[in-house]
């Protein structure tokens, strides 16, 4: 087996490029071998793969001219319509010859091509993600020149036209920008802005200019169509972390130094706790909106699922279970108030509106653009509350089982009491719905 490799290398050393790349035997019938003739493609013998050992002394300039004369006598029948074999040999000499430098871009590339590539890379970066990284843009071979500095970005109004930040300098964020939310969550957007800059203080952030490039318009269109909760999550993250992005979790990597995964369960629960304790939702003389209550229940259920399936904390974090119990108790209280109003016959659902258009009167509910009458509204509300309550029962049972696995202590006892209390509230609300 050891002798087969040198013999195979000897057979391939004098072969043409096509036979060498395919690792097939070449009959070396210059100027065109049999396989290249069958494939109807030019048969090229590279100078770098010629037989014999490489010379001890560096080759002279005459060797390159002799190689050009040698490869210029090939059969013109086998050449491609776009160019001759002599041009291909010259290109191979420029790339594979000794002392030659491999050029990424052709010499005929102009500054206009580089500017077009910069615009394309910028649009792709803006469409694929919310942040623009200059490091990925500078890796493009068409931009690795001084012509890139002539490319001007769309600066917002009020900035100097001649000023442009260096690509290598870190971005300067003078203020925290609250992401744009759809009209349905407009009340939360105003609350987020008041939480960032003071509840009674003036709004110091200048609204971004709407006359932006087409890529920003595409992003805003995507937000309005399908990324409703993604924009809401960014707004919650802006308030929770003061606009610094996802916070680092100190206990996760310290407890699991060999784990490459990063657990964001506590981050999600901190956002949920911020929502639950928000002044807009915790008003003494009024109840929470019905659509916001349903949204919080959906968020609680998704966090339950993430915590139970998390491979980092392995569903054993008592602090996570305690936080989820507190948030779940808030949601169950809101749903039980709705069930109590339905069972007692009191029509207090005028404030539980969900929709894009205002209702005709204060006692109607809008779902999308359709206004429901009293009977249909009560039936839909009853079905929604019953479904949401029943969905949380197996989750609470799973939490009770996970709590028994943890070490006994005051926190474990508190979680057991909270789970039993939440389970009792769920059964009580379901009983009121059946009456």
UniProtKB/Swiss-Prot annotation:
Residues 50-59 have a biased composition (Basic residues). It is found in: Nucleus. One of its GO terms (molecular function) is zinc ion binding. Residues 76-89 have a biased composition (Polar residues). GO terms for cellular component: nucleus. Residues 48-89 are annotated as: Disordered. Residues 16-43 bind DNA. Keywords: DNA-binding, Metal-binding, Nucleus, Transcription, Transcription regulation, Zinc. Residues 60-74 have a biased composition (Basic and acidic residues). Transmembrane segments: none annotated. Gene clusters encoding host-selective toxins (HSTs) are localized on conditionally dispensable chromosomes (CDCs), also called supernumerary chromosomes, where they are present in multiple copies. The CDCs are not essential for saprophytic growth but controls host-selective pathogenicity. Transcription factor that regulates the expression of the gene clusters that mediate the biosynthesis of the host-selective toxins (HSTs) ACT-toxins responsible for brown spot of tangerine disease by the tangerine pathotype which affects tangerines and mandarins. ACT-toxins consist of three moieties, 9,10-epoxy-8-hydroxy-9-methyl-decatrienoic acid (EDA), valine and a polyketide. ACT-toxin I is toxic to both citrus and pear; toxin II the 5''-deoxy derivative of ACT-toxin I, is highly toxic to pear and slightly toxic to citrus. This is Transcription activator ACTTR. It comes from Alternaria alternata (Alternaria rot fungus).
